[in-house]
Amino acid sequence: MSTTRKKAPTDFRAVQVELEVKVNAPPQDVWDALVHRTTHWWRKDFYTNPETKGFHVEPRPGGRMYEDWGGDNGALWATVLTVDAPRSIQFMGHLTSQYGGPAHSIFRFAVETSGNGSLVKISDTIFGNLSEDQAARMDEGWRMLFEDGLKPYVERG
């Protein structure tokens, strides 16, 4: 038996991402898409496997946010911590070293009425091994998912 020791990550940091996205649709429609039709708006280029069949959220405490690869295969992105339907849902996720970690992420999606539509607020706190570049890309990733994914999907009806 052999043992290999590696130096602990030196890019330990905490990053806070806050984002607001205006959606021209009622809050209930936004909530429904956010937690029940995620697979329809979640960007395919964010999938971890080319064989992914769908992306799902189980909107209950202890529920999963996960990629379904078919059969019993897939990738767990996060576990649901709190649900206050149809207003907010909070998750705890993990970034493995394959995706820039190891790091933990606590993120929350909130839906509010805003004029004739909705305001989606995304808040994510990531702490762990993240390079400066990875930390900067967290904001870009959430922006792409919600501005280029959720927003046009819901607004098309």
Regions found by a protein language model. Name each.
Residues 64-70, 90-98:
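Short beta-strand segments that buttress and anchor functional surface loops
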Residues 19-21, 77-82, 105-113:
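Hydrophobic/aromatic beta-strand elements that line small-molecule binding cavities or substrate pockets
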Residues 95-98, 123-130:
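Short, solvent-exposed aromatic-acidic interface loops
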Residues 37-75:
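Short beta-edge strand/loop motif at the mouth of beta-sheet-based domains
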Residues 84-89:
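Short, conserved beta-turn/loop elements at beta-strand boundaries and strand-helix junctions
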Residues 2-3, 126-157:
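A conserved amphipathic terminal alpha-helix motif
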Residues 1-52:
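Hydrophobic ligand-binding cavity/cleft-lining segments
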Residues 30-34, 65, 80, 91, ...:
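Hydrophobic pocket/interface hotspot
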